[in-house]
Amino acid sequence: MSFANKQDPKTLVLFDVDGTLTPARLTISEEMKKTLEKLREKVVIGFVGGSDLSKQVEQLGPNVLNDFDYCFSENGLTAYKLGKELASQSFINWIGNEKYNKLVKFILRYLSDIDLPIRRGTFIEFRNGMINVSPIGRNASTQERNDYEKFDKQHHIRETMVEALKKEFPDFGLTYSIGGQISFDVFPTGWDKTYCLQHVEDEHFENIHFFGDKSYKGGNDYEIYNDPRTIGHAVNSPDDTIRILNETFKLQ
């Protein structure tokens, strides 16, 4: 057993990052760090996010691989256990360049034809296990992200674009998952956040808790939140996460 030092080594608590451990794209608070330190003495902890590890380091700190027992970047396609890297998967190897080029050409053409209040840079971000598509671009400032999120709720830009992609590529075997404030992920069906659970099977956890803020249908926490292997906790903010952790695990 890898976690014999814990009070309850058969319980794993997994967290989404944006909106759950940190405000969207911002850094972790001292209060959250202290809460997680207390929690880690009792149980096994990990995070699972769609971003790559470099962005998770920006948000959760440079010692992230040591601060969590499990670190799952890109939904677990890149994975670490106790600081050691586990086997990884590649989106481009799975889809192939021919299909990938068709997908990207359609996305860029679609984005050029829609009316948006602003455009910045990095509309398609290529990652190891997925692509991330942002109509206004990932280089938007925090204020621009907040403004766009309100605009998107009114005009359903991402939702409409996802439907257009599903219609254009019905046989590509892709899932489209809206997450964060300004973007959505595109990845092979089955490579959602439940993908990370295969990395923890060898520990035979009796309880796996998951905390996430996008647990509604179409949100990028939906599949793992509703998976029969997990106990789902829907949160509205990092403060909400701390409150539920204190109540559930008696941390105070």
UniProtKB/Swiss-Prot annotation:
GO terms for molecular function: metal ion binding; phosphomannomutase activity. This is Phosphomannomutase. It holds the Pfam family PMM. Keywords: Cytoplasm, Isomerase, Magnesium, Metal-binding. The keyword Cell membrane does not apply. It comes from Candida albicans (strain SC5314 / ATCC MYA-2876) (Yeast). Belongs to the eukaryotic PMM family. Disulfide bonds: none annotated. The active site is at D16, D18. The keyword Lyase does not apply. It catalyses: alpha-D-mannose 1-phosphate = D-mannose 6-phosphate. Its EC number is 5.4.2.8. It comes from the Eukaryota. It is found in: Cytoplasm. NCBIfam families: HAD-SF-IIB.
